[in-house]
Each structure stands twice: as structure tokens, then as C-alpha cells.
Amino acid sequence: MTKLFSLLLVISFLSLFSSAATSSSSRPPPKFLGSAFARSKPNRNSPPPYRYETRYFRQNLDHFSFAPLPQFTQRYLVGSSDKWSRNGPIFFYCGNEGDIDWFAANTGFVWEIAPKFSALVIFAEHRYYGESMPYGSQERAYKDAKSMSYFTTEQALADFTVLLTDLKQNLSSEESPVVLFGGSYAGMLAAWMRLKYPHVAIGALASSAPILQFEDIVPPETFYDIVSNDFRRESLSCFEAIKKSWDALDRLGKVHDGLTSLSRKFRLCHKLNNTQQLSDWLSSAYSYLAMVNYPFPSGFMMPLPAYPIKEVCKRIDNDPNGNDLLDRIFAGASIYYNYTGNVSCFDLDDDPHGLSGWDWQACTEMVMPMSSSRENSMFQPYDFDYTAYKEQCVQSYNVTPRPRWMTTEFGGHDIRRALKTFGSNIIFSNGLLDPWSGGGVLANISESVTALVTELGAHHVDLRASSPEDPQWLVELRESEVELIKGWIRDYYKQRRKYFSM
């Protein structure tokens, strides 16, 4: 394989928002980890790491209309039920923005703790992702704004609720306590589902769920400030080198044959059209490195060493050959894009046949303002420009974003009061190395809406499978989560016995 075509999906909104401007412009905002693999398929030739059966369920296309509309088939995965008994606990993972097999393979925590509770494990796929395509195919589902109009978080939550209700009835287990799980976007869904449908599940673990990353609830520069701080804490000289590299890229790109030189220097499969393509490619690498800065080797996105930012900065700081700045930047980025050394050239082009589902979501409901500050960020400075953002969404999908809809639907500036008044049994776990933690719940809301925060945690690291290299703080974090879930289930059965003894 001579091209790393899977990189295409890592470059956030590149096809939507590519721009040569670096200030007061709409730049490609970052995606969640799952978005990077929204269109990728797991390796079907290797067996899944956990035992489960693939099943399908007929869902209504529109849960909020009584008009006759077609149904679609939703995929879900059911774990081994050897230890599960009727009315026993159900652990339900709310599907992210991608193929559900991939999330099941990378959420070892749920599989590992399920036997301790004799729980049945369910992973449900999100509509419009993986095999759960309305209208029978992705091409037809993604055809236009009309065919994608049912592609919303509200419809997805209703899918999960209907599926769970039907499943419990078919299993004759209407009294089974359900615990919701999710990381990143799925963590947001788990928290929102617990709020919106509290009768369906007794609690939710929402890992790395940035439910506050809307409107101006948190400063728009928060995400890139955290990424920058991750690099600064590792090496100030590395941080400074990356910050200087953007001007170096632009200067070389403007000279005669400069784009050709850059294309050769960064081993690109095709000649650059502009320097912004390369800047976006590098920005994506730095952002995702911050998300997956795990304390153990991982292959969650790409094969990476433990603490990959440390390794990137080693290459940028310690070049024995005395290479120039951009050569060192390429060497650092290669830790992310080519740690195995198997890639001969890099393809920066996005999918020519269409846009990913997450781009649609970001152009409709999931509007998360992002900017990069001159003072604290190592990235090119820019301001969030909603007008430009909206124009690109109209151009791409013929839709106008609704930046206030998610806060209207699930709680905005008063989300803490809403959680305290109406919420219960929700764990918000965040690691402060994760750039999405800036939009997360970082303090306890009430006795039962709990924030578990780790200083050295990255993006939903707690949901990954356990490893001998796990640091003590990660072991203790997972133990705390298990104890809280035990309490929810114990209280549920206690109340149920009390109710039936009356």
C-alpha cells in the first residue's frame, strides 16, 4: 500500500472549510476520534477481540411524525449471554459517528467489567453510519438535505430507546437495569439519553463528553489552547518550533517551485495546490496526538507509541543531522502518520465522492465554535467566523446551521442547573490532556452527577481495554467508575424489592 488513504478522514472539514486565510476566517475545526473513521471499515479478516452476535432491528425513519415513511435497518451487537440471566443488568453503548464494530473493538472497559455484573453487553450503531443506512445505501442516504433530514441526535436517541425497549420485551426482561456508556460524541449521547429518557436507563458513564462546547459556554480558543499546552508541557522548544513552522511553510510556498519543494519535503503523493492543505494536515496530527496521548502503545487511530507527543517532540528537538525546521516538523508528524515506516507517500486529498456524516451533523446541530489565539496557541491564529461557516454549509448541503439548537434541546448556559435539578446517576469522566475536556463537566454537579477528572488522562482513555502499562491513576479511575455503577445497580434492585414487597 503506497498511500495512506485513511488519513483523508482525519483532516477535519477539509473539503468544507479549506481557506488560505489565517485570521478572522473559518478554519477546519477538529473532529472527534470516531469521525476520523466514520467511513472506514474494520478488518473483517481478523476475528473481533470480543465475542458478540450481529443483529438487526427495523427502525422508523422518523420517530416524531405519524406520516407514512419508510423504515431502515439498524445494526446492533449483542455480547455473549452465558452469565446473564433474565432481568439482569444490561450495559448499552450508544453508538458514535462510525462503524459500530470499530467502537466495540476499542471499548474494552465495558467488555471487561460486564462479567463482574453478569451484564449483557449491547453496542448499538448510530443511524447514517456503518451499516445502519436509511434508504438502503449510503449513496441514497447522503443524497441531499431531504434524505439526510432525519440525521439528528434526537432521532438517534429515539432509535436507542426504541431498540432497548423492544429488546427488553423480547428477552422478557422489562425489569433489567440499563447502564449507558459512551465516549466522545457517544458520551454526549449517553448523558443526553439519561436526561431525556430517565425511565429507560438507571445511569450513564459519559467519558470525554464535551456537552458544554456550544455557543459561548466555553471560550472558543479552549480546544487549541489545551493541545498547545500539551506540547508546551512536554517541551517549550518543541512548542516554539511548531509555532514558527507555519510562517516557514507560507514563505516556502510563495517562492518559485515552493509548492513542489514542500510536496517533496513532506513526501506527498500529489503536488500541493496551496500551503493551507499542508497546514491542515499538520494541525490534524497535532490535535489527534493530544487526544490519543495515552500512557501505553495504542492502535486506536494509527499505531502509536506510549505518550506519542513526547516522541514527536524528540524528533523536532533532537535532530542529529541538523535538518532545517520543516524537515524536523515532518519527522515529528511522521510519528503520527507513519510510525510503522510503511507509508511511502501521503495523500492529502479528501474523499472525492462525498462528505462524511459528521460534516452534516456539524452543519446542522453540532456547531462547536473554535478559534486559535495568538497568545497561547501554537497554531495559526484565527477567529471563528460564523458567517463563513454558514455559507459553506449552505453551499455544501443547502442547510443553515442552528448553533443554539443543542443548548435549547439539552440545556445551555444553565446545563449545570438542569443536571442538578433533573439529572441523576451520570458520571462525567475527563482527562485534562484531552483537548475536548475544556467543554466537559469538570466538577461534581450533585451527589449523583459526578465528575471524575484525571490530570494525565487523554480522550476517553478509561474506556480502553486495561493494559499492564496502565498507570495507577488510570486503574483507580476505572475502579471508581465500577463502584459508582455498582451503587446504581444495588440501589435499583433494592428499590425494586421494596416496591414489590408493598
Predicted regions and their residues:
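Short beta-strand immediately N-terminal to the catalytic nucleophile in serine-hydrolase-like folds
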Residues: 180-182, 207, 429
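Active-site machinery of serine-nucleophile hydrolases
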Residues: 82-83, 88-90, 95-158, 448-466
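Catalytic-loop region of hydrolases
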Residues: 2-120, 131, 433, 483-502
